[in-house]
Amino acid sequence: MKPWAVGLGPPPPAVPLLLLLLLGAALVRAAAPPRRYTPDWQSLDSRPLPDWFDKAKFGVFVHWGEFAVPAWGSEWFWWHWKGEGLPQYEQFMSENYPPGFSYADFGPQFTARFFHPDTWADLFQAAGARYVVLTTKHHEGFTNWPSSVSWNWNSNDVGPHRDLVGELGRALRKRNIRYGLYHSLLEWFHPLYLLDKKNNFKTQFFVRAKTMPELYDLVNRYEPDLIWSDGEWKCPDTYWNSTEFLSWLYNDSPVKDHVVVNDRWGQNCSCHHGGYYNCQDKYKPESLPDLKWEMCTSIDKVSWGYRRNMVMSDVASECEIISELVQTVSLGGNYLLNIGPTKDGLIVPIFQERLLSIGKWLSINGEAIYASKPWRVQLEKNTTSVWYTSRGMTVYAIFLRWPENGVLSLKSPVTTSTTQITMLGIQKDLKWSTEPEGLLIYLPQLSLFTLPVEFGWTIKLTGVE
């Protein structure tokens, strides 16, 4: 006899078989061990890219190191001077420094005296950056953190006597900005690197004593959201032990679930292997790539590091920067914009102005940028000035030139009975009509002083196909 038949209560409700099956499947998934990646590109390249990176869209790159002391030519100063012996660099040194002055003598002058990480982080936040990438070590080998394998050539032993990497990371994370660490695999003049080079990179003295210990240290110490590798081009990934490091990073590191890496892990890797593609500096594809990519570029068109001989014609304009940002995001990329601080840790006003202008633009148009996806059409037909993005069922048309007649003509969107059209930064709906030449949008009659932004306006279209 059933318990409820003798007055012990009603029968329990029947549990649907489907619910039991779903519960069982969930328990199996929960019990299943996480996928592990083997140290080969087929396995590593199959790892899904963490969502945060594609949603971020815009980041700030910071090139900062010993090269900010001479601050002349570019961040490749040491190589141009001693590696290539370029006459203009030799002349610069002879005119400005005493005989026998070495590159290491710049060390004490790299003071970072006015470096206030919270000030930097506030600026980057105001710029609308969702991630920031700092050079932990450029090709010169000087590390911006107390690396135990860079004795007397790091920011704790020489110059600032501070952990620059750690300080900036703490400031950024207080503002929920993702933190990326740039790291150069090679060092131009390190004795062990030169020894491996002499041996045609058949030995790995430098990799085992310097490169790999530093990468593991950076990950365990700072838990970065992104590792921006560089300096790979002389050697294959097998010399750098890249796949071994990345398999550890994806399987066992403290950042295994959210870390993102680029594609510079060996001379055979760029644009072929990695978490996302940089390909080369200032890479700009002509059509929508199959995989996630990032355009890295610099406000100073000539140099990544700060240089005192920069002139205004070398500086990217606000219009140029916004245009590149829009085109990059429309084609599915992220836009990483570089600035170079001074040896004192200051970000010069022209760089601040450019960053703040982007932040102002994004405060109005960010809806069309952050977390967007490429639409079925990226560039409006027969034009170079209208680019599309999308979020769900909403389409955004960003136009870079205001039509003289005040009417924007679009051929790609197909209207429906539910179509609504607005401009970001303007509260009311816009008038529109469909004509044989396409969708005609009648832009608001506003002065330059009442427009939401001065350049790059966004039309929001809902209910279109």
From Swiss-Prot:
Keywords: Glycoprotein, Glycosidase, Hydrolase, Lipid metabolism, Lysosome, Signal
Any one GO molecular function term: alpha-L-fucosidase activity
Annotated InterPro entries: FUC_metazoa-typ (IPR016286), Fucosidase_C (IPR031919), Glyco_hydro_29 (IPR000933), Glyco_hydro_29_CS (IPR018526), Glyco_hydro_b (IPR013780), Glycoside_hydrolase_SF (IPR017853)
Signal peptide residues on this chain, from the entry's feature table: 1-26
Protein name: Tissue alpha-L-fucosidase
Main location: other
Compartments where located: Lysosome
Its job: Alpha-L-fucosidase is responsible for hydrolyzing the alpha-1,6-linked fucose joined to the reducing-end N-acetylglucosamine of the carbohydrate moieties of glycoproteins.
Catalytically driven reaction(s): an alpha-L-fucoside + H2O = L-fucose + an alcohol; a neolactoside IV(2)-alpha-Fuc-nLc4Cer(d18:1(4E)) + H2O = a neolactoside nLc4Cer(d18:1(4E)) + L-fucose; a neolactoside IV(2)-alpha-Fuc-nLc4Cer(d18:0) + H2O = a neolactoside nLc4Cer(d18:0) + L-fucose
Domain of life: Eukaryota
Pfam families with a match to the protein in the record: Alpha_L_fucos, Fucosidase_C
Pathological association: Defects in FUCA1 are the cause of fucosidosis. It is a lysosomal storage disease characterized by accumulation of fucose-containing glycolipids and glycoproteins in various tissues.
GO terms under biological process: fucose metabolic process; glycoside catabolic process; lipid metabolic process
Site feature May be important for catalysis, where: C296
EC number(s) given by UniProt: 3.2.1.51
Provenance organism: Canis lupus familiaris (Dog)
